[in-house]
Amino acid sequence: MGVKQRVAAFSLFRAALCLWLLCGRTSGKPVRKCGGANPCGSPGPPVVLIPGDLGNQLEAKLDKPSVVHYICYKKTDTFFTLWLNLEQLVPVAIDCWMDNIRLIYNRTTHSTSSPPGVNISVPGFGQTYSVEYLDPSKRSVGMYFFNIVQALVDWGYTRGDDVRGAPYDWRRAPNENKEYFLALQGMIEEMAEKAGGPVVLIAHSMGNMYTLYFLNQQPQAWKDKFIKAFIALGPPWAGVAKTLRVITSGDNNGIPVIRPLKIRSQQRTAVSTSWLLPYAHSWPKDKKEVRETLGGQEELPEDWNTTAKVFREAGRRVLGVPSGRKMEEMTWWWSPKIQEINPRF
């Protein structure tokens, strides 16, 4: 789902969401706005926002041994915005961006790392700015959680206090983001203790999978004490069919200057992409999930009726994987390790 669609979905939902959050304090009366000469306390429980895939800013600092183009920066003294930076998504410059944001998979450790000399950081944990706007310049194309945050602020919440963001490295699956979950747990506990009551978690898209994964690791006593509610916006509980297109032919998320096939190589390196593939435990074994054309091939054969078969053949025909070798030995995104971390209810 593109940024514009996300904003539309949030706008439709925010009125009902905020009424639910505030119903315990308002008793049906209109909510008065706060600020300036009209201060007031928090109107409801603390709120934590967990973004989806591509849903928060990423920054990078470079000290690379080599670059893919002479125009690419090889070394930077400070961190700069990697996502969302529209200036880096234009032709030629996008090659620099892709080389910086990609992940390298280690088939031995089943873990990923950034390219040599690339240091990626996630700005704004505990704040809201990096989830309100994906582009620090606050261009409308990068507006994300802004409408929800601003509505909460108008009703008495304070940015960075009782409404906070929990951004993360969305390129990775949750098993590689353990430090993030420890920080999230600590922030939830801090907010609950300060407010004298539990916290509301609001997640969008893949953020719901991250949230569910996090909650499944917590004992019931912890959840009873610190979590008031978990509000799921657009949760992909059964996986995302669009992921098939992302990996087989690429997806530009509606950005016209980016060719899908150009961005495909980077999208394939993100472990989170494979994590969103339709989950085997959610679909009948005989359900056909794909009937499309693939590259220069004719219509997919009749027996390509499962995700597994699609990717075996896609890898062999499109990626040039030798037919005598297992896919998991050639491409990280077919590794059974990915399926092992799927969240369950």
Feature map (PLM): residue ranges:
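N-terminal non-catalytic accessory region
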Residues: 2-202, 206-278, 283-295, 300-305
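C-terminal subdomain of alpha/beta-hydrolase-fold enzymes, centered on the catalytic histidine
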Residues: 301-345
